[in-house]
Amino acid sequence: MSARPFSTPFDRERRVRSTLKKVFGFDSFKTPLQESATMAVVKGAEDVFVCMPTGAGKSLCYQLPALLASGITIVVSPLIALIQDQVDHLLALKVQVSSLNSKLSVQERKELLSDLERDKPRTKLLYITPEMAASASFQPTLNSLVSRNLLSYLVVDEAHCVSQWGHDFRPDYLRLGALRSRLAHAPCVALTATATPQVQEDVFAALHLKQPVASFKTPCFRANLFYDVQFKELIPDVYGNLRDFCLKALGQKAENGSSSGCGIVYCRTREACEQLAIELSSRGVNAKAYHAGLKASDRTQVQNEWMEEKVPVIVATISFGMGVDKANVRFVAHWNIAKSMAGYYQESGRAGRDGKPSWCRLYYSRNDRDQVSFLIRKELAKLQEKRGNKPSDKATLLAFDALVTFCEEVGCRHAAIAKYFGDAPPACAKGCDYCQNPAAITKKLDALERSSSWSKTCIGPSQGNGFDPELYEGGRRGYGGFSRYDEGSGGSGDEGRDEAHKREWNLFYQKQMSLRKGKEPKIEEFTPPDEDCPLREASSRKIPKLTVKAREHCLRLLEEALISNHQAAGSTHGADLQAKAVELEHETFRNAKMVNLYKASVLKKVAEIHKASKDGQLYDMESGTKSCGAAAEFSEPSDYDIPPTSHVYSLKPKRVGAGFSKGPCSFQTATELLGKSHSQKQAPEAMLEGGQEPPGWVCDLQDEDRSKPHPGYQEKALGSSVNCGDPSPEKKTKGSSQGSAKARASKKQQLLATAARKDSQNITRFLCQRTESPPLPASVPRSEDASPSCGDVPGKCTQEVGAQGHLVAVFQTEGPRERPSTCSLRDQSFPEGQPSPLKETQAEKRPRPQQGNPERRAQKRLRPSTKSSILAEAKDSTLASDRSTENKVAQEPCQLSASGTSLREAADIVVRHLTPFYKEGRFISKDLFKGFARHLSHLLAQQLSPGRSVKEEAQSLIKQFFHNRARCESEADWHSLRGPQR
């Protein structure tokens, strides 16, 4: 859809001028070129390219035609801040304009999309970013507008971002070429303020502008801007110089104390912004810093104060200014050199948009030049490592060299800028420091050449005879080198000069050595502690360079923190806080090996104490001791606690008794043993009533060593003695038999552990209902091959499993086998209502709410399945199934299945196999590489072909994609790629 049809050219011009006056409030256009560009866009017969300086009125060239058109104009802009500034300006003019970006709320986004779905949308201009234009969420809206023929124009603002030869290249702008191809019926308008001939050609090619293109370009010369360069090396007080410049540019203050304008000072780093704002404020210029390190609210407040002219000067990084439209900026100063001529021209062009005289100053320093040059080359090196060398890489260096030439060479500043952008030399009329006083600039450059910082650029003699006192032995020419022997005959005069030179050098050497002798570092002597020093091991010199005074200071910090903690917690009982502080300090001293580690540990403890005080809790000395890594005794674990990793000696089964000490034997009565076993029985029953199974059911699934903990851990957990002889018959109850079996290392225990591992892989053990049963009598022997899991509750569990059909025999007769891989457990399915053992192990310590009736859950677990089950298989088939599972795990460990593939796993595999193609340059940009990897990962996560892994499918799809395609140039390339079908 083009612009609204007009009967005659006169009618078109009349409507344009009427809208210009009625909506924008202008009687006429700012320049004839602006009027010509606007009329060309309104006509809609060809694509338009507009290149005008900042403040020349580029936005009006597309905003006015958009209001006259009957459809919607899509405007692509690089920054949300710039978009918001344009939207606010148009809303103030009562223009129906909207922005679709990530900062919209859900309600605002819903209202905007519903308006775009109308037959006649109210929105006239829709601002989006290039990322939004390429996003999948925007495509349905775009397709709807295209299908209904509701698009009037496609506008690309800041079009120089599309060129790799430009100073602000953005890869997302390259995707706009595909968008332009889809909207071939709508005229395209490209606008920029800085465009060299090379950049202009790139814009035409990348945006697929139809030839011939109506090009409107204004010369870059702005007569109201005065350019000058100041050399930091030649200024005694550079901060004072900047203050004088600010006050002169701002002019006289009004009666209320406010200035008639404002100014911007650009710095390269955040630290420089903060420092410069402080220096200017201390010298009488109200200035505030603005950079990305500030909070969003602080940045907004500083910007608003500057816009309202409460703060006349803002010191900012280069990120500030693109989204700000302020006409009365009287000066722009660059504290450091910019990265390119185009960037400097764009930033300095933010001054004087109202057409009044304004000043642009650059503070130049050789040190800044070297730093920026190093950063540019470093960035190029990183890019070249990823994508190789490109011809556009030279453009970055050439753009920076052009700005260096602008500062260092003698000549008109405006002429240097015009030469860079391909314009004819303008009539400066004393609009720069050189044209105003050429002799002064020439004198400054000569002084700069003679300054110390510039003499280092070339190693040469500073004296007539070639001797340079700053170089070793006067330098090559001063020393003479091989030239002495080339002369054939050295006279007595040469020998005399050599002798004098040698004496001078000896005197210089002796003088330097005498100076160095006085600067030898003094060895610090250790100051012994006082007699009343409260520190433990105060005279110890375990930590080098740690003084007693420093330890006493740390002790006071700990003591003060403990006192404040007792006060905050409201503790009433008296405690020797100094003794506690001494203990904490000594513990930290004993564990640290360096001074900085010691101080860091003390500060960490102080922070922990303050945190406890803030929470109103009394600081626990024992917990603090454990947290800092000191040796502490392990507390007695309960039956539901999994031993920590430090208690498990190895993941492999070990022969108990070969290297572990049994510990001292202590006497314990039978009454204590029976009471302890009774308390251990009640805990699993309470857990069953609360809707959670004891972790003992599933410990064997995770690790076979869980059934056989460390001997030292067993002794503390059981709390019973270990006799060297055989246990008495009275102790063979349900609780004591298990404890005695775990307490001694024998072949019987190894067989029990093997059976437990084998039993843990069988699904039928999860169908058993755990019920309380009386302890076995002493006369009933316990089967040596029984599983510990079933042996704990030998009553109803054994009977129910036996009723399913000779499964008990399987448990008792199967021989030991290798432990299956953990990955095979993930693929096992569990009965309905029964949680996965792995998940149960992870969540066994987490409290759960009550989940219904336990009897009803038991019925759900015992519900028969309509599919074939392991319960109906015979013994041989069960063993065969187990062997096949082991073989599969041994051949393909941890291989992803089709049903269990997650998006993250698929993404890792896709990126791993797609990266070589990216390094070969098969993707035009990194964003395309990310987009294709995301698309392929979603395809693989949704479905897989039967019998194929994620790796195989990924390789197949990548090979299919690059079969007839040399490079991936747009997202449209993979739209036809389909995922695997089942």
From Swiss-Prot:
A GO MF label: DNA binding
Highest taxon above the source species: Eukaryota
GO cellular component entries: cytosol; nucleoplasm; nucleus; replication fork; transcription preinitiation complex
Cofactor(s) listed: Zn(2+)
Region described as Interaction with POLR2A: spans on this chain: 491-621
Transmembrane segment boundaries: none
InterPro entries on file: DEAD/DEAH_box_helicase_dom (IPR011545), DNA/RNA_helicase_DEAH_CS (IPR002464), DNA_helicase_ATP-dep_RecQ (IPR004589), Helicase_ATP-bd (IPR014001), Helicase_C-like (IPR001650), P-loop_NTPase (IPR027417), RECQ5 (IPR010716), RecQ_Zn-bd (IPR032284)
Ranges for domain Helicase C-terminal: 241-398
Region called Interaction with RAD51, residue ranges: 653-726
One GO biological process term: mitotic DNA-templated DNA replication
Record has Flavoprotein as a keyword: no
Mod. after translation: Phosphorylated by CDK1 at Ser-728; this phosphorylation is required for RECQL5-mediated disruption of RAD51 filaments on stalled replication forks.
Family: Belongs to the helicase family. RecQ subfamily.
Name listed for the protein in its UniProt record: ATP-dependent DNA helicase Q5
Organism: Mus musculus
Taxonomic path: Eukaryota, Metazoa, Chordata, Craniata, Vertebrata
